A protein has these predicted regions:
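Mid-to-C-terminal polyanion-binding domains and interfaces
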Residues: 196-198
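Phosphate-binding chemistry for phosphorylated carbohydrates and sugar-nucleotides
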Residues: 1-194
Length: 198
């Protein structure tokens, strides 16, 4: 939603990014998105083979080479997606995992700062989301674990944003499903507005 994502400003910032798509579906769309946002992209595991070069779960123990690459290339951020591009994992400029729970929390913070409304997360997502929502006098509703449950609840309470602590961001204005491309655009805009460091 370009109302909240300032594409020209992101392009001017020229973020330097390590991108790891585990040779999954993201290898088609993620490099294209980042390049259109003016990022300098260092691609890792972005071959369109569907053959995973490492264990595909985007957890720190599987991302050691990606974290080292962020440090080596002195990038602003590392962006990792899972094979079907619904989960987003970020790596700080220091080469440290940002934490999937932090991703959903910061995405909610950014979006509620632009558009107030209800948020839905699952029962296992961090309570930090509630703290962020309360800053904007917004309500958080909880659903059972699972994307379908979160989406159903979002529709029921007309939520403006939702997701899960696993790094899945759901923005109904874009799609009623977890979407790492949407999460990436939100997080780059968030970085831009809050100083460029995580």
């Amino acid at each position: 939603n370009q109302k909240y994502i300032n594409v020209p400003k992101i392009r001017r910032r020229r973020f330097k990014v390590v991108l790891d798509c585990v040779n999954g579906a993201g290898a088609y769309s993620m490099p294209l998105l980042l390049k259109r946002l003016g990022c300098e992209v260092i691609e890792m595991n972005c071959e369109r083979t569907g053959i995973f070069p490492r264990l595909p779960e985007p957890i720190p123990e599987n991302l050691k080479a990606t974290m080292q690459s962020v440090k080596k290339h002195k990038t602003d951020i590392g962006i990792v997606v899972d094979p079907d591009v619904d989960r987003l994992v970020l790596i700080t400029e220091k080469g440290e995992p940002f934490g999937e729970e932090n991703t959903i929390t910061q995405a909610v913070k950014f979006y509620l700062s632009k558009k107030k409304g209800n948020t839905v997360v699952n029962l296992s997502t961090t309570r930090a989301v509630d703290d962020v929502a309360s800053e904007y006098n917004c309500k958080v509703f909880r659903s059972a674990v699972g994307e379908a449950n979160v989406v159903e609840k979002m529709k029921g309470v007309k939520a403006v944003i939702g997701g899960e602590g696993s790094g899945g961001v759901i923005l109904p204005k874009i799609v009623f499903g977890r979407d790492a491309l949407t999460g990436t655009a939100i997080m780059l805009q968030h970085l831009l507005e809050f100083g460029g460091k995580m």
